């Protein structure tokens, strides 16, 4: 009950104003104060700085630099698998996509069309496909990498709410991931014929911005209207394991995969911790 009340209280909070303030504060260069706050954050969330490319907490000019810290080379070896985990975090849910329906939590599902910003034709390409919802906590590495090689075809910034995306909120707020602000990145598998796949970066309260490697910072600005960018064939190609984007602080990634035989890692289960590069799934022969 306390968790539910805390989640319901989010409806009354000025989430957008708080997030704007947090974004400005996180980008500020405050010298020793920034270092002191980073040290406090690392202690509170038990962040493993030993694996960071720069383990010196005094070496980050702003909180944003710390949140988006790189890892040391070799810190996340890539498994030999058709699909690898694109992030560090925990499994929220995974499984089959129904006809325009994705499972969120017990008693809750949401529309694929709504998740993708209202594009029913694109959503239909994922009917009877597969999804994985992956939660990044504040302590996790905040960059997002490619689960397989792909060629970018479209990016959409969808305006929306800024609820928290932690597991407690996912169990209470209907259609959470299709309500929050998000950046939809649609790819074609390269080389084919794997079909389309989408990485959807879900915004959240206090997540100041999201960025991609080909565009840079996507938000802010937050104009309140849907924005779409289309990409020519061959314009943006990324290899498996290559960075594609990043969050400031932490949030959720929803991965959509097309119809076809697929076997998720048998060790996968909701709430299980995952790490970038681990085996996620194998495509199966028809």
Curated annotation (Swiss-Prot):
Homology family: Belongs to the phosphatidylserine decarboxylase family. PSD-B subfamily. Prokaryotic type I sub-subfamily.
GO terms (BP aspect): phosphatidylethanolamine biosynthetic process
Cofactor(s) it depends on: pyruvate
Residues the record marks as site: Cleavage (non-hydrolytic): 250-251
Cofactor note: Binds 1 pyruvoyl group covalently per subunit.
E.C. code: 4.1.1.65
Pathway membership, UniProt: Phospholipid metabolism; phosphatidylethanolamine biosynthesis; phosphatidylethanolamine from CDP-diacylglycerol: step 2/2
Subcellular location(s) of the protein: Cell membrane
Cross-referenced InterPro entries: PS_Dcarbxylase, PSD-B, PSD_type1_pro
Gene name of this polypeptide: psd
UniProt enzyme class: lyase
Catalytic activity: a 1,2-diacyl-sn-glycero-3-phospho-L-serine + H(+) = a 1,2-diacyl-sn-glycero-3-phosphoethanolamine + CO2
Single Gene Ontology MF annotation: phosphatidylserine decarboxylase activity
Protein name (Swiss-Prot/TrEMBL): Phosphatidylserine decarboxylase proenzyme
UniProt-annotated catalytic positions: 88 (charge relay system), 145 (charge relay system), 251 (charge relay system), 251 (schiff-base intermediate with substrate)
